[in-house]
């Protein structure tokens, strides 16, 4: 119970910095040079990239609003892998935990003028105890295109949102997690890692995202 209260408290503390992270990410993009080998398909009318000198709060609201109101794609999410870090768990626990997160989700997304990814999503999947766990939120990824094939992309960023779990009585819990991806054309393999302590947390979770 103490651990749960601690995690909830930490989540509540970290959630307010999410808009700052979004603003910081956009600021980095605005001051960095373009390294792509060829143009990418982005939203040329993206209002977020056109506005300078905005507050971090306004920039964050614009990012969310643009993603919601002017998405470039609608996405299907398919949870694929849950893996409990064997170096941080007793075998008796991992033997009985579920690692097949059956479920599905839906979202909208866009690429900004820098070719970086913004998305809003909601998913539901079977958790470690084989109970339904919903999660929804916002994701941002800085995108790199290391080859001449611009459809092949690598991403690194964060996701912020809210989840609810059966073993926490489905109390809404804010989350702030790292996000990474490998993408080709309309298909992305995205993943996050949930940090924790011994026998708690330390879970790798990944899903497929298909643009429709």
Curated annotation (Swiss-Prot):
Bias kind Polar residues: ranges: 36-47
Record's keyword terms, sorted: Acyltransferase, Cell outer membrane, Membrane, Signal, Transferase
Catalyses which reaction(s): a lipid A + a 1,2-diacyl-sn-glycero-3-phosphocholine = a hepta-acyl lipid A + a 2-acyl-sn-glycero-3-phosphocholine; a lipid IVA + a 1,2-diacyl-sn-glycero-3-phosphocholine = a lipid IVB + a 2-acyl-sn-glycero-3-phosphocholine; a lipid IIA + a 1,2-diacyl-sn-glycero-3-phosphocholine = a lipid IIB + a 2-acyl-sn-glycero-3-phosphocholine
Primary residence: membrane
Molecular function GO terms recorded: acyltransferase activity
Family of this protein: Belongs to the lipid A palmitoyltransferase family.
Functional summary from the UniProt entry: Transfers a fatty acid residue from the sn-1 position of a phospholipid to the N-linked hydroxyfatty acid chain on the proximal unit of lipid A or its precursors.
Alphabetized NCBIfam families for the sequence: PRK11045.1 (NF008271)
Oligomer and partners: Homodimer.
Protein name: Lipid A acyltransferase PagP
């Amino acid at each position: 119970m103490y651990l749960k209260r601690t995690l909830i408290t930490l989540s509540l503390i970290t959630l307010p910095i999410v808009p700052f992270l979004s603003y910081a990410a956009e600021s980095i993009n605005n001051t960095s040079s373009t390294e792509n080998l060829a143009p990418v398909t982005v939203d040329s009318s993206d209002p977020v990239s056109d506005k300078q000198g905005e507050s971090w709060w306004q920039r964050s609201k614009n990012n969310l609003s643009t993603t919601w109101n002017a998405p470039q794609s609608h996405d299907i999410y398919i949870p694929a892998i849950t893996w409990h870090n064997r170096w941080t768990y007793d075998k008796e626990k991992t033997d009985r935990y579920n690692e097949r997160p059956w479920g599905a989700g839906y979202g909208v997304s866009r690429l900004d003028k820098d070719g970086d990814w913004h998305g809003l999503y909601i998913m539901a999947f079977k958790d470690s105890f084989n109970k339904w766990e919903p999660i929804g939120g916002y994701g941002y990824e800085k995108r790199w295109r290391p080859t001449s094939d611009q459809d092949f992309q690598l991403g690194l960023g964060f996701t912020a949102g809210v989840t609810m779990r059966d073993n926490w009585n489905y109390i809404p819990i804010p989350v702030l997690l790292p996000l990474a991806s490998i993408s080709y054309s309309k298909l992305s393999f995205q993943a996050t890692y949930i940090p924790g302590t011994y026998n708690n947390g330390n879970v790798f979770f990944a899903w497929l995202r298909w643009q429709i």
